[in-house]
């Protein structure tokens, strides 16, 4: 195991969050170890000073420790092993902690809600990235080498093979989301997956594609399986709640036989009658809102300028349902490259700080260690190690990101919208081959590269002019 996530470090973190008895849950996203806590008053905020920890975000019931990509997963696995060896609490202590946890939840409802999205979508992100990269590379090769869509031979076969993963992922994505969502909301994953599959089935007997459900109406009422991800999330939440209510009254001997059966019947009825139409309306409204924001240069600037703040508070995972809605409505994720400009603005700010710092200062060492991950789309080392502790550079980094978002918004406003070819992917320079547009991959790559360049330059200029005054540059 790497030094940064040694057992000594994890034991220290465990002690500083109040010990094993204060841990309610242990999980991770791409870059953070997420520890749910019963009592936040027991948490020592100086965890962020530990060597190997790149930052800490504290909420009323969760501690997010920033390690970085890959390391967060290893840290979570090791921490889970440590927690598994922890002594069992007595009933009185558990009751007292549950009371404190309930009180904390009353003041953090929004963060609790958004944290669910991390639980649902974080396990899917590596697949999004892999499938998106393969699709982007295949599309780039086909464009550069002028390979027709109906071409035959080894190269076309290889390109089709690279593209098939993206098709498979997005064809059956709702089933994966339904499974994870049902679990996140406290239900059984397979029940959520089965309910999600109802949104995939076809209800038109004359259709020549898809999977026919076997009926075209629900007891005489029309079926309109719209809403996709939004509807599936609502249905999975309802499924978990209904399962909990059914299990509360179900005798233990009949639980395995009847609980899921009754849950599926009730949830499917609600899905056909209420959730599918409701999800469709919400889906259309959300798509309309963000499509209009994406085509509005000022809206793009605001979104890009505020995204770093969302990352700091750990609520950026809340955008993932929007990404999926845009994929369904546009065929690409036009919001993601706009938000990616936030990280590019931070790179420009960090370079300005490096330029203004003394040759052998600690700040220069910090920037050198964090700039490469920043260029590749991993922004936490720059946020928590360089810009946020000095505040002014963090603000100018946000302004640099806003300038990049404004650039992409202007290009879209002039008639060339572009976006990511996947619901989620890497940002920074790594995302270049994942860009796509109605005019092809090369114009999309050029626009994205232009936005990054604008954000770099503006972040550098804003920080040089306004972000270094009365700021510690040592």
From Swiss-Prot:
<dbReference type="InterPro" id="IPR001996">
    <property type="entry name" value="PTS_IIB_1"/>
</dbReference>
<keyword id="KW-0598">Phosphotransferase system</keyword>
<feature type="topological domain" description="Cytoplasmic">
    <location>
        <begin position="179"/>
        <end position="180"/>
    </location>
</feature>
<comment type="function">
    <text>The phosphoenolpyruvate-dependent sugar phosphotransferase system (sugar PTS), a major carbohydrate active transport system, catalyzes the phosphorylation of incoming sugar substrates concomitantly with their translocation across the cell membrane. This system is involved in N-acetylmuramic acid (MurNAc) transport, yielding cytoplasmic MurNAc-6-P. Is also able to take up anhydro-N-acetylmuramic acid (anhMurNAc), but cannot phosphorylate the carbon 6, probably because of the 1,6-anhydro ring.</text>
</comment>
<keyword id="KW-1003">Cell membrane</keyword>
<dbReference type="InterPro" id="IPR036878">
    <property type="entry name" value="Glu_permease_IIB"/>
</dbReference>
<dbReference type="InterPro" id="IPR013013">
    <property type="entry name" value="PTS_EIIC_1"/>
</dbReference>
<feature type="topological domain" description="Cytoplasmic">
    <location>
        <begin position="1"/>
        <end position="123"/>
    </location>
</feature>
<keyword id="KW-0813">Transport</keyword>
<feature type="topological domain" description="Cytoplasmic">
    <location>
        <begin position="323"/>
        <end position="334"/>
    </location>
</feature>
<dbReference type="GO" id="GO:0016301">
    <property type="term" value="F:kinase activity"/>
</dbReference>
<feature type="topological domain" description="Cytoplasmic">
    <location>
        <begin position="462"/>
        <end position="474"/>
    </location>
</feature>
<feature type="transmembrane region" description="Helical">
    <location>
        <begin position="302"/>
        <end position="322"/>
    </location>
</feature>
<keyword id="KW-0808">Transferase</keyword>
<keyword id="KW-0812">Transmembrane</keyword>
<dbReference type="GO" id="GO:0005886">
    <property type="term" value="C:plasma membrane"/>
</dbReference>
<protein>
    <recommendedName>
        <fullName>PTS system N-acetylmuramic acid-specific EIIBC component</fullName>
        <ecNumber>2.7.1.192</ecNumber>
    </recommendedName>
</protein>
<feature type="topological domain" description="Periplasmic">
    <location>
        <begin position="145"/>
        <end position="157"/>
    </location>
</feature>
<keyword id="KW-0418">Kinase</keyword>
<feature type="topological domain" description="Periplasmic">
    <location>
        <begin position="415"/>
        <end position="440"/>
    </location>
</feature>
<feature type="topological domain" description="Cytoplasmic">
    <location>
        <begin position="390"/>
        <end position="393"/>
    </location>
</feature>
<dbReference type="Pfam" id="PF02378">
    <property type="entry name" value="PTS_EIIC"/>
</dbReference>
<feature type="domain" description="PTS EIIC type-1">
    <location>
        <begin position="115"/>
        <end position="474"/>
    </location>
</feature>
<feature type="transmembrane region" description="Helical">
    <location>
        <begin position="441"/>
        <end position="461"/>
    </location>
</feature>
<feature type="transmembrane region" description="Helical">
    <location>
        <begin position="158"/>
        <end position="178"/>
    </location>
</feature>
<feature type="transmembrane region" description="Helical">
    <location>
        <begin position="218"/>
        <end position="238"/>
    </location>
</feature>
<dbReference type="InterPro" id="IPR050558">
    <property type="entry name" value="PTS_Sugar-Specific_Components"/>
</dbReference>
<dbReference type="GO" id="GO:0090588">
    <property type="term" value="F:protein-phosphocysteine-N-acetylmuramate phosphotransferase system transporter activity"/>
</dbReference>
<feature type="domain" description="PTS EIIB type-1">
    <location>
        <begin position="1"/>
        <end position="89"/>
    </location>
</feature>
<dbReference type="InterPro" id="IPR003352">
    <property type="entry name" value="PTS_EIIC"/>
</dbReference>
<feature type="topological domain" description="Cytoplasmic">
    <location>
        <begin position="239"/>
        <end position="260"/>
    </location>
</feature>
<keyword id="KW-1133">Transmembrane helix</keyword>
<dbReference type="GO" id="GO:0009401">
    <property type="term" value="P:phosphoenolpyruvate-dependent sugar phosphotransferase system"/>
</dbReference>
<feature type="topological domain" description="Periplasmic">
    <location>
        <begin position="356"/>
        <end position="368"/>
    </location>
</feature>
<feature type="transmembrane region" description="Helical">
    <location>
        <begin position="124"/>
        <end position="144"/>
    </location>
</feature>
<feature type="topological domain" description="Periplasmic">
    <location>
        <begin position="202"/>
        <end position="217"/>
    </location>
</feature>
<dbReference type="InterPro" id="IPR018113">
    <property type="entry name" value="PTrfase_EIIB_Cys"/>
</dbReference>
<keyword id="KW-0997">Cell inner membrane</keyword>
<feature type="transmembrane region" description="Helical">
    <location>
        <begin position="394"/>
        <end position="414"/>
    </location>
</feature>
<feature type="transmembrane region" description="Helical">
    <location>
        <begin position="335"/>
        <end position="355"/>
    </location>
</feature>
<dbReference type="GO" id="GO:0008982">
    <property type="term" value="F:protein-N(PI)-phosphohistidine-sugar phosphotransferase activity"/>
</dbReference>
<feature type="transmembrane region" description="Helical">
    <location>
        <begin position="261"/>
        <end position="281"/>
    </location>
</feature>
């Amino acid at each position: 195991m790497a030094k940064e996530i040694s057992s000594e470090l994890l034991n220290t973190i465990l002690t500083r969050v109040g010990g094993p008895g204060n841990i309610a849950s242990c999980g991770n996203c791409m870059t953070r170890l997420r520890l749910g806590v019963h009592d936040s008053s027991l948490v020592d905020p100086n965890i962020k000073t530990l060597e190997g920890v790149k930052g800490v975000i504290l909420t009323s019931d969760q501690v997010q420790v920033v390690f970085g990509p890959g390391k967060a997963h290893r840290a979570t696995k090791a921490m889970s092993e440590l927690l598994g060896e922890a002594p069992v609490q007595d009933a009185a202590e558990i009751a007292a902690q549950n009371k404190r946890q309930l009180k904390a939840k009353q003041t953090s409802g929004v963060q609790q809600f958004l944290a669910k999205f991390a639980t649902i979508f974080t396990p899917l992100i590596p697949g999004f990235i892999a499938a998106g990269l393969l699709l982007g590379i295949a599309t780039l090769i086909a464009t550069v080498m002028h390979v027709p869509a109906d071409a035959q031979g080894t190269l076309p076969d290889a390109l089709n093979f690279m593209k098939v993963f993206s098709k498979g992922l997005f064809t059956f994505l709702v089933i994966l989301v339904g499974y994870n969502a049902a679990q996140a909301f406290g239900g059984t994953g397979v029940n959520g997956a089965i309910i999600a599959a109802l949104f995939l089935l076809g209800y038109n007997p004359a259709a020549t594609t898809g999977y026919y459900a076997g009926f075209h109406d629900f007891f005489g009422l029309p079926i309109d399986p719209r809403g996709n991800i939004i509807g599936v999330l609502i249905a999975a939440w309802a499924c978990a709640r209904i399962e909990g209510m059914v299990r509360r009254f179900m005798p233990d001997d009949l639980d395995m036989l009847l609980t899921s059966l009754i849950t599926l019947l009730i949830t499917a009825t609600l899905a056909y009658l209420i959730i599918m139409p409701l999800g469709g309306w919400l889906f259309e409204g959300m798509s309309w809102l963000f499509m209009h924001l994406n085509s509005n240069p000022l809206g793009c600037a605001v979104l890009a300028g505020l995204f770093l703040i969302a990352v700091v508070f750990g609520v950026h995972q809340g955008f993932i349902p929007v990404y999926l809605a845009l994929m369904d409505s546009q065929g690409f994720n036009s919001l993601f490259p706009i938000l990616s400009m936030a990280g590019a603005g931070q790179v420009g700010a960090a370079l300005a700080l490096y330029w203004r710092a003394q040759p052998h200062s600690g700040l220069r060492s910090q920037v050198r260690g964090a700039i490469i991950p920043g260029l590749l789309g991993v922004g936490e080392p720059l946020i928590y190690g360089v810009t946020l502790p000095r505040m002014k550079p963090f603000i100018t980094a946000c302004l640099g990101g806003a300038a990049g978002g404004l650039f992409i918004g202007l290009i879209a406003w002039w008639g060339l919208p572009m976006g990511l070819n996947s619901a989620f992917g890497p940002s920074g320079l790594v995302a270049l081959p994942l860009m796509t547009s109605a005019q092809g991959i090369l114009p999309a790559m050029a626009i994205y590269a232009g936005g990054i360049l604008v954000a770099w330059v503006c972040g550098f200029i804003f920080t040089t002019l306004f972000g270094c005054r009365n700021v510690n540059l040592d």
